From Swiss-Prot:
Interacts (via SIM domains) with SUMO1 and SUMO2. Belongs to the SOBP family. Implicated in development of the cochlea. Residues 314-335, 417-433, 565-582, 590-603 have a biased composition (Low complexity). GO terms for molecular function: SUMO polymer binding; zinc ion binding. It comes from Rattus norvegicus (Rat). Keywords: Isopeptide bond, Metal-binding, Phosphoprotein, Repeat, Ubl conjugation, Zinc, Zinc-finger. One of its GO terms (cellular component) is nucleus. There is a cross-link at residue 672 (Glycyl lysine isopeptide (Lys-Gly) (interchain with G-Cter in SUMO2)). The lineage of its organism: Eukaryota, Metazoa, Chordata, Craniata, Vertebrata. This is Sine oculis-binding protein homolog. Residues 1-25, 304-360, 413-484, 550-616, 725-750 are annotated as: Disordered. InterPro entries: RAI2/SOBP, Znf_MYM. The modification Phosphoserine is found at residues 627, 694. A motif (SUMO interaction motif 2 (SIM)) lies at residues 648-652.
Amino acid sequence: MAEMEKEGRPPENKRSRKPAHPVKREINEEMKNFAENTMNELLGWYGYDKVELKDGEDIEFRSYTTDGESRQHISVLKENSLPKPKLPEDSVISSYNISTGYSGLATGNGLSDSPAGSKDHGNVPIIVPLIPPPFIKPPAEDEVSNVQIMCAWCQKVGIKRYSLSMGSEVKSFCSEKCFAACRRAYFKRNKARDEDGHAESFPQQHYAKETPRLAFKNNCELLVCDWCKHIRHTKEYLDFGDGERRLQFCSAKCLNQYKMDIFYKETQANLPAGLCGTLHPHMESKAEGTGVQLLTPDSWNIPLTDARRKAPSPVAAAGQSQGPGPSSSTTVSPSDTANCSVTKIPTPVPKSLPISETPSIPPVSVQPPASIGPPLGVPPRSPPMVMTNRGPVPLPIFMEQQIIQQIRPPFIRGPPHHASNPNSPLSNPMLPGIGPPPGGPRNLGPTSSPMHRPMLSPHIHPPSTPTMPGNPPGLLPPPPPGAPLPSLPFPPVSMMPNGPMPVPQMMNFGLPSLAPLVPPPTLLVPYPVIVPLPVPIPIPIPIPHVNDSKPPNGFSSNGESFVPSAPGDSSAAGGKAGGRSLSPRDSKQGSSKSADSPPGSSGQALSLAPSERGRGEVVDLTRRAASPAGAGGQPGFAGVLHGPQDGVIDLTVGHRARLHNVIHRALHAHVKAEREPGAAERRTCGGCRDGHCSPPAAGDPGPGAPAGPEAAAACNVIVNGTRSAPAEAKGAEPPPEQPPPPAPPKKLLSPEEPAVNELESVKENNCASNCHLDGEVTKKLMGEEALAGGDKSDPNLNNPADEDHAYALRMLPKTGCVIQPVPKPAEKAAMTPCVISSPMLSAGPEDLEPPLKRRCLRIRNQNK
């Protein structure tokens, strides 16, 4: 080709070298063979015979000579492409053809008896035997050549191209398109019929009448979907009983759509007049009027007051109510309804509803009424009457009552038992303040109007119909008969009765007349009511002490710690230790030793059961420094604070069960009350203690001297559970706050006394460390103190020097735990001798025991 173009051949030669017709003929032959083979294969799959193709079956439109024919055929194709309503076969073949008057169709047997026409085109119809019973009658060529027929599928007039014999009738088609469509539909119908076995079950005559499409009748049943009207090739044809007939649907989708349509129709028919506009009678398919309001999810939220403002449209449907209930509106007997409702006109709602307009109240769905039906004789224009078990009630009023009932508690909804008395003024059980006006019933407007307008409006509309004796007892009786007051169509609220209104008997209390909108006292409010519930709050409670342990007179139990009383108390009573902030652990150990001390000291020493020692290892001692200085000569109990805080006792306690108990009490006790020694004296006292009672300053007052007010100051205690001297020294670093009151004169323990004290301390420490029971130590101390001589054969047990040891720390269960007093900030330096020297700590238990013993004795003596 390119060479020819290079040679300069004119393009006409190129075009002339492409004879379209021969090539097309070859393609047509191939296509014919392919189409024939494919169609035969497909038909063979479904068990049908092959299709016989003949030479003249492939019709080309370009071969038509007459323009009319071609236009006619083209128009048929165009119209086939558009959706057109199909008529039943009977009308297609018989009546419609007769009316059209085409000569090409005979009405007798449906066969094509058209006269022979021109044989110009030599058209031969395709013979397609779909099923064995219907046979294909190949008409003579003279009959088929150019016959004008009405296509059995598209129902257009055209040249007969194909004909299909269906038993007693022959269908003619104007084109292959129509023929294929008809054959496909017929095939699907047969297939569905064969698979579902509905052919012999149900008569299908109604399909030919209801379906807009062409329904084929071949002495067999048709399976047309009752919803989509299609002939489906499917196994899912579903039977659905609809009254006296059975419906068939090609799929669950169609069935569901049908059900929704029925539901829509029924619901629309049962809606109140205001919610749906003009509706046709109940079972009519769809409302045709333009005023129809579709049932949408919003319809349920439309306030009834808005709906009532529209004049109720005629609804002949049975029952428009959503629930039963005592009807407080115009309850008329069936006879009255039949006679009066014809002329009764619904009263329009007053336009002014300023106070109680309740558009916000959505319709409340309640139980369906017992029986809903239009009373006999009610014309379609009258408001719908709801037949309840208490008589016919106008629908709008019935709906109002349902809403009002939802406001009232359910137990108030019962029928009033005094209904039998027509003369008793009856209050509306829906609203406590609503009742007939004193002057008798007032009509809403025209006395003929039964429409009892909203009970929630400020205009109270009592029923206008007198009580009928035939009404069921559950029906709320209307007010007693009386002359209607047409001049007061809407009695104002002020005319409501003021006296107590009778209520149902099940409510045994009279309700005073309330405003129409005042909620009843038993109104069920859907709001949460906050009820105060007691919430347990943890309150620290002092641990119960041993029977013999009493809180010292000077101590007030404050949770964990005992707050010392005022220093004056300590000075006043020798037995009152007011200045000691005593934790339970202090009391456990120290006071266990002094529990049996004389009554004066017994108050100071809180002896707790040994079992209580196991509590937490950290003791919170909040001391109140009643006086700047601890009880005279109590620096030994002045807690050694790590920090300068006055009221904090830092207890660095080892994890030994005993070390909990080594918390010292700052005693306000009059430890043979002595004046507060100066710094030098304190140093001396410290020296006494460390040096085993080097003689204290001579200035120390006698043990009986009352401690100065400073003596009441509590001391911070540091318990160092380590034996190492450095640790104790660290723990012993006194915060400046606690001026450990100078060691009580201790009667200036002579150096010999420390030895005796050491002996006793050895004894007591042995007992404590071996027995690990402060109870035993307590017993020992109790014995010693009670005998005042010391059952322990301690010569210095009652030694005034031992008693004077204000620095004497309580006997520690373990020798390595030393509690050291904390001096005042100014006297920090003075207290340095009070710190137990490391050599003493490292000297061994015997070196440590004498100071410990001395401390125990001092504590005991102080308690004395």
